[in-house]
Structures are given as C-alpha cells and as structure tokens.
Amino acid sequence: SATNYEAINFYHEQFGIQRAVLPRVLALPQIEHVVNNTPVEIEVFGYGSLCVMVEGRCALSAYATGLGPNQHGVCSPAKSVVWEEKPDGLSTRLAGYLIDRFATGERAGYPTVCKGRYVVGGERYYAIEEPASLDTLALLPEFVRIGVAAIKIEGRQRSPAYVAEVT
C-alpha cells in the first residue's frame, strides 16, 4: 500500500502507473497532500469495512493462513475459509482457527481474524476490533474540491447482494 506521494511518484516513474488507490486509513488532509504532489490520478475508498491493519499488511491473516494479502490479493482468502453448519448454529474458521460462532438465524459476516468474536476471560466479544464501516458520502464535495479522481466501493469478499445494496 502506498500512503504517500513519494511512493506513488516512484511507481509512476518506474512503472508508468496512471492511477493509485489510497488506503482508507488516510485522513482528508493527507489525501489532499498526496493529490497536490503527484501527477497520478488518486482514487479513494468511499464505502467499506475499516481495519486496524494498514491495508495490504494484515499480519493476523498472514499468520493464520500463511498467505499475505499483498502477495495473494486478499485478507482471509476464500480457500482458507470454512463454514461449519451445526445444530446449534454456524461456526466460521480461517485456516482451522475458530473465528466466530453464530446462533441459528443470526447473520454471519465474512470471517476475518480482526473482527472475530472470541471468548476471553469467560466473556464473548470482539477482542480486537468491532466491525465498523467507512461511509464518506458526506465527504464527496470535499473529494471533488481536492481533486480526487474516483471513489472506490469495496466489493472483494462481498456477496452480489452486498454490492447491489451499497451501489
């Protein structure tokens, strides 16, 4: 993930990139600083899941699966995910690690290590991070003002129903 204009300019000069997607962890002033200092078109996430890791550098997923997101394109790769339907509900596992259990009829999200619910000290909760979403609808005028070229809506690891709902 490139988080600054120097890195983006390097990829532009060395590989001729024309557009870069910034990680969703950057604040508006940081995005503006990048836009103002590179000839590369800048795309930002407008909607999607937030993460405690810098995008593309998920150490938790890489540890659990042996597959780093930068090299394999995704956190919690589908080939490492197992859904186990049992009489008392649904269990989700990533590379054999139990990520979450859902009661019968409870909505189940895609299993990621950072957003799993775990039993810690006898209590079941989101031990690392509660699921949260990025929604930049209110920032669209600012994105236009600072020169953002495009808005990205997360779709990888999402069902067609999810993509249809948010677009």
Question: Model-derived features: where do they sit?
Answer:
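Active-site pocket-lining/capping segments in soluble small-molecule metabolic enzymes
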Residues: 1-6, 21-150, 157-167
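Structural motif
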Residues: 14-15, 146
